């Protein structure tokens, strides 16, 4: 459709925001796009609501590929792309490792990190057997900021977590443990330091009976966040107000709280006390901090607290 502007410029115009792509259920089962056991989940069509007021060439290309492919070949979106690049197809994603496959099964992800339904057999085989992880775990290889950031963007650790959670829900505990172990083996902490994306590994390890692994990871995260808090409390007040420092402090405190909750629930009281003591060493009211008087209790001249 053509649209003529007030300046007599002729533009291509799509007179709708809603587009759909028909689904031949028999075909997608026959060619393996959807497993027979999931036949009842197949939708009649993909319904997409286009956002914004214009489509660029790459977006038109995506729509054209989906329309003309007619479920003949697999179509994927890269996992590291931003939500705006997914054009509304994310509710039809299936996470298969480093990419999302478009499948005619609708899910409703709550956030960016939950995009893509999981077929545990496919994802497990990909990340455990088919993928080659290269030399990330080789101590001789330098993982600089660029590589570290790329690994974070690609959400590999979170992919392993989601796989393990799905396997645990399906009662496949040994495979769930293997998936978590594989994550820490291929993306080891000595190469790619622990970050807060590993937080949910801990309760899962506990629930799977891997207490020692959960404790080790909990302590690693606790030390990391303790060091962040200790650094922040070494700053002058005017520096604390700059940038995202106060937000970083809040985040680290929240992580510590979650860790203590997980550890206590698992009955690991000694570790919980050890972590509490680390944090208390920063906020201890008897160790008056020159720049943070608001966190101190009043201390009289005799040394007793009031």
What are these regions (language model features)?
Residues 1-306:
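ER/secretory pathway lumenal C-terminal domains and tails of membrane proteins involved
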């Amino acid at each position: 459709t053509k649209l003529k502007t007030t300046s007599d410029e002729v533009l291509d115009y799509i007179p709708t925001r809603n587009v759909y792509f028909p689904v031949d259920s028999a075909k997608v089962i026959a060619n393996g796009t959807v497993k027979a056991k999931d036949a009842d989940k197949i939708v009649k069509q993909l319904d997409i609501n286009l956002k914004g007021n214009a489509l660029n060439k790459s977006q038109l290309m995506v729509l054209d590929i989906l329309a003309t492919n007619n479920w003949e070949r697999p179509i994927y979106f890269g996992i590291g792309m931003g939500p705006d690049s997914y054009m509304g197809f994310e509710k039809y994603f299936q996470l298969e490792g480093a990419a999302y496959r478009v499948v005619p099964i609708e899910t409703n992800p709550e956030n960016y990190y939950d995009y893509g339904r999981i077929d545990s057999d496919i994802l497990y085989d990909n990340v455990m057997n088919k993928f080659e992880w290269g030399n990330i775990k080789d101590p001789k290889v330098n993982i600089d900021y660029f590589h570290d950031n790329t690994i974070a963007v690609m959400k590999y650790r979170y992919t392993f977590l989601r796989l393990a959670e799905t396997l645990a829900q399906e009662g496949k505990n040994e495979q769930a443990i293997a998936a978590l172990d594989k994550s820490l083996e291929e993306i080891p902490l000595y190469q790619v330091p622990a970050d807060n994306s590993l937080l949910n590994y801990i309760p899962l390890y506990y629930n799977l009976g891997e207490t020692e692994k959960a404790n080790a990871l909990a302590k690693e995260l606790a030390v990391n966040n303790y060091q962040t808090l200790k650094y922040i409390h070494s700053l002058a007040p005017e520096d604390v107000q700059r940038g995202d420092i106060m937000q970083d402090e809040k985040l680290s405190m929240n992580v510590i709280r979650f860790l203590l909750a997980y550890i206590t629930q698992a009955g690991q009281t000694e570790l919980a006390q050890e972590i509490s003591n680390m944090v208390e060493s920063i906020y201890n009211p008897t160790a008056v901090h020159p720049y943070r008087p608001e966190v101190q209790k009043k201390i009289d001249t005799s040394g007793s607290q009031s």
